[in-house]
Amino acid sequence: SGNAITAKGLNDIIPPVGLVFWRWMVAIPILVIIAWPHLKYDLKKIRENWKILIILSFFSITAYNTLLYQGLLYTTAINSFLINASRPMFIVLLSIVFFRNGINLTQSFGFLLASLGTVNIIVEGQVGKLLALDFNIGDLWILGGTICWAIHTVFLRKSPSMHPASFLAITVTIGAIILLPFYILEIIYVAPTPFKLETVGGVLYLAIFASIVAYLCYNRAVEIAGPNKAGQVSYILPISGTVLAILLLGERIELFHIIGLPLILAGIYFGSKDK
């Protein structure tokens, strides 16, 4: 929850690509120190599996956070939490698309409910906006980021068997390298990253807690429980995130949030049923 809250609080101060870039640049040396004892043993696996590592790095490290932070320029943190809550449904759907995983009638019903809830939030409960394709661009950016995270989660099953710290260190490094040209373009055409007390504090929080701690825990959860069950963390995030957005950012919960969230959570519940 702290990732989107911090990014929303800083989006009037620091451009989105710069925030993502410096978040990872601060995290990299810390990760390398943590992973150093394991990297020499995993180096061969890194060389042999560079293609899948680039794919995972792009969709999680580069694309997901950039799209999320870009979207938060135009929409609320509450919307971002509720749209992100639909990740388990995209994980199930993409598992079918890429790996031919089966889906039963109950899971199909769950996907329908979650989709209705997500669309309800994006169109703010107004059917006219849906018919006119009048969407908040910020919500669409975040939806794109949500799909990127689902792709990352699904393809984690193809990642090489290596120490979690080594895996995170190499994917963060690759992701930051991919992000570098976009950061340079942002400096030239949008604005440079200002280095102030609040930006430094925000970047440190994102680098340590939202990057290192959160990613290590999530990747480990996927390794142990599988992508579908690990994605169930989305039950908790929209509720805790909404509370934090109200308390820390002064955001308001609207009727379309109240309608959309139960639909998404019900969709996650039915979508996780194997039978």
Task: Show where each model-derived region lies.
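Small-residue-rich packing faces within the transmembrane alpha-helices of Major Facilitator Superfamily
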Residues: 1, 25-29, 115, 150, ...
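Glycine-/small-residue-enriched transmembrane alpha-helix faces in small-molecule transporters
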Residues: 1-21, 58, 129-158, 177
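Specific transmembrane alpha-helical segments of multi-pass solute transporters/efflux pumps
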Residues: 1-6, 32-84, 120, 207-225
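Membrane-interface helix termini and inter-helical loops of multi-pass transporters
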Residues: 5-13, 43, 73, 122-135, ...
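Hydrophobic/aromatic residues within transmembrane alpha-helices
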Residues: 10, 19, 23, 71, ...
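Transmembrane alpha-helices of multi-pass small-molecule transport proteins
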Residues: 12-63, 88-93, 148-152, 169-188, ...
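Helix-helix packing/entry segments at the starts of transmembrane helices
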Residues: 20-22, 65, 79-86, 155-177, ...
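Hydrophobic transmembrane alpha-helices of multi-pass small-molecule transport proteins
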Residues: 31, 94, 103-125, 179, ...
